[in-house]
Design a protein with these regions (language model features):
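Hydrophobic alpha-helical and helix-loop surface patches within well-folded domains
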Residues: 1-246
Length: 248
């Protein structure tokens, strides 16, 4: 990066150490490398790339004190740090399982938001990701699929926000403690190896004692989203609303 912009590094990466500390606590697996650096490159075409222990980022993420209340690199920083576990320590075997890298990084960056900014901000982030998913409601391709002609096609809403939402639903279904235990086991058992989605499924089923085939079939291996029917009834006597939601 230009020497003239080096003073912006402290603003841009003010959260990096806190992110590393939080992920070690939340994931339960120590940071797996000897060091961690951020390097900003001029004319870098992507937002960031999670090279093991050395993330490369665009200089567009740099900012000064004058704009610190208008912008933040926290989300990108947390996303790339999360990849040190999900993408570097353990990585997808082929592009069809990219969500195992990007979905986890997307979700864990939101978990860091919850840690530092609270649950309402976390929910706001989830809502924003959901809007990104439903903006592609005509899409008929599942998260895991091999019908792509170029790997770049896999870097889509399916791997990022939809993958993150699948993890959030699974965490909500199983509870935070069990989810955390499953993720820790997944990383420890497959560290320095490549994985497919079934490797993740097997660990969640083993530790939960439940079959999750319906969950993963519906949300990962099949496309679209569920259609629901909502029934609304007002009880004048009790002044209460009876609301029922059923999947069609």
């Amino acid at each position: 990066m230009p020497p003239s912009e080096k003073d912006q590094l402290a603003n841009t990466f003010r959260d990096t150490i806190k992110i590393l500390d939080y992920f070690e606590r939340e994931i339960g697996v120590p940071y797996p490398w000897d060091k961690y650096y951020n390097a900003c490159a001029i004319d870098y075409m992507w937002g960031g790339m999670e090279n093991t222990s050395l993330t490369t980022l665009t200089t567009r993420t740099l900012f000064t004190d004058a704009t610190e209340n208008l912008r933040s690199s926290r989300g990108l920083d947390a996303h790339e740090v999360a990849h040190q576990w999900f993408g570097d320590l353990v990585t997808c075997r082929d592009w069809s399982h990219l969500w195992l890298n990007e979905g986890f990084a997307t979700y864990y960056s939101l978990l860091y938001d919850r840690e530092v900014l609270g649950n309402d901000y976390f929910k706001h982030g989830l809502h924003g990701n959901a809007r990104g998913i439903f903006g592609n409601d005509k899409d008929i391709i599942p998260i895991v699929h091999q019908g792509y002609s170029n790997p770049s096609q896999q870097f889509s809403f399916r791997a990022y926000p939809k993958g993150g939402w699948v993890l959030h639903m699974l965490r909500s279904e199983l509870g935070e403690d069990l989810f955390r235990k499953c993720v820790k086991t997944y990383l420890e058992r497959h560290q320095y190896k490549t994985v497919v989605t079934q490797d993740l499924v097997e660990i969640f089923e083993e530790l939960s004692g439940r079959s999750l085939s319906q969950f993963f079939d519906q949300w990962v291996y099949l496309s679209g989203y569920p259609e629901i029917k909502i029934n609304y009834a007002w009880d004048e006597l009790t002044k209460q609303v009876k609301l029922s939601i059923n999947q069609v």
